[in-house]
Amino acid sequence: MLERHIADYHFIADPTTGMTMRWGTTIKDNPTWAPVPELADISISNHCSKGCSFCYKDSCINNDFLNVEDYCSILDSMNHPKYGNVFQVALGGGEPLEHPNFLEIIAETCRRSIVPNFTTNGMLLTPKICGSLSGKIGAVALSVSSMADLELKKLAFLIDAGIKTNIHYVLSKNNLEEACMILRGCYNEKLNGINAIIFLTYGSKYHRKQNLSSYKNP
């Protein structure tokens, strides 16, 4: 269990299940914010070979990678002398799995008792890579903008390795009907074993200009 107790703020997390509890002076108090960071988002590259139109970073093939030494320096800089380190990091890109030192980055994160999570397009997921990540990852999120893009075998690789798997479904005016179908349970069988599906509305500069409010639910 991970614990942090600071004056009238208390936090407990189970890194295995992902369960967290926060309370204030008493168990009934709900703190507005944490006095020190608990999670950090870290972009380890801006390199990606897929070129999704909705990418909020407009990532491309540029071999722009954060080196392991600098990554470790970032982790160590977040270690408070009194209250300790952040509990989790969310690794993004670019495509994290295209980073040549990705497994080393995961190892360095775990060595500091920080739980790593990451978002991926899933193209490079294999049974071998999922096996290497098993027991080391809090959760993996697969980014899609269509259920047709969601490969069942990629989901199976993660689920069979015991890795908690989420879906990041990126919304646009072109897929709102499908998003509503997801909410109605039309894809429950395909999503069996998924921890959560999260609908995201942000994206590239072009994507953000689309007017989602123009959609009318049939």
Residues covered by each model-derived region:
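N-terminal [4Fe-4S]-dependent radical SAM core
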Residues: 1-41
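A C-terminal junction/extension of Radical SAM enzymes
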Residues: 2-3, 188, 193-218
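A short, flexible beta-alpha/helix-coil linker loop
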Residues: 26-29, 58-62, 203-206
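Canonical Radical SAM [4Fe-4S] cluster-binding loop centered on the CxxxCxxC motif
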Residues: 31-70, 83
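Active-site micro-motifs of SAM-dependent methyltransferase domains
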Residues: 50, 98, 204
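Generic structural signal for helix capping and beta-alpha/helix-loop junctions
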Residues: 62, 126, 175, 206-207
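Radical SAM/AdoMet-radical enzyme domain recognition
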Residues: 68-91, 99-201
